[in-house]
């Protein structure tokens, strides 16, 4: 690797560490000419997923767009950015695992909904209300009722307050 200080092409790796999630390797290097130390990171390069929109247009999968949706849904909720970043990484990993080149936008929406359901019930309702284009209060009530029913069926789910 080319030294950023002197441009020499020979270096030596003096330390390698894997990230907590196992997707990145951090390497400390030293230039064999000038002894300058620097850090490099290795990541697996995934093929770019394309999102197929409702109107059949295609665009590159945008991590930031997914994160923005999560952040908006979790606004003023006790959810950390680290948790949202992890959720985005999980969503993207699942999409790469399940799809080779293209993924329908509806599939991304479903994954986001699943993650939000587990993270925060209020954020989930916010996101679902926009995603499914709720037009009246009855739709909110119906969704909350379904959530409550699901919680009763699955005791491992978070308990929601009774309205």
From Swiss-Prot:
Per its UniProt entry, which superkingdom is the organism in? Bacteria
Q: How is the cofactor bound?
A: Binds 1 zinc ion.
Q: Which UniProt keywords apply?
A: ATP-binding, DNA-binding, Metal-binding, Nucleotide-binding, Repressor, Transcription, Transcription regulation, Zinc, Zinc-finger
Residue span(s) of domain ATP-cone:
49-139
List the PANTHER family: TRANSCRIPTIONAL REPRESSOR NRDR (PTHR30455:SF2)
Which NCBIfam families has this protein been placed in? Answer: transcriptional regulator NrdR
UniProt-recorded name of the protein: Transcriptional repressor NrdR
Tell me what organism the protein belongs to. Answer: Akkermansia muciniphila (strain ATCC BAA-835 / DSM 22959 / JCM 33894 / BCRC 81048 / CCUG 64013 / CIP 107961 / Muc)
Taxonomically, what lineage is the organism? Bacteria, Pseudomonadati, Verrucomicrobiota, Verrucomicrobiia, Verrucomicrobiales
Q: Which gene does this sequence derive from? A: nrdR
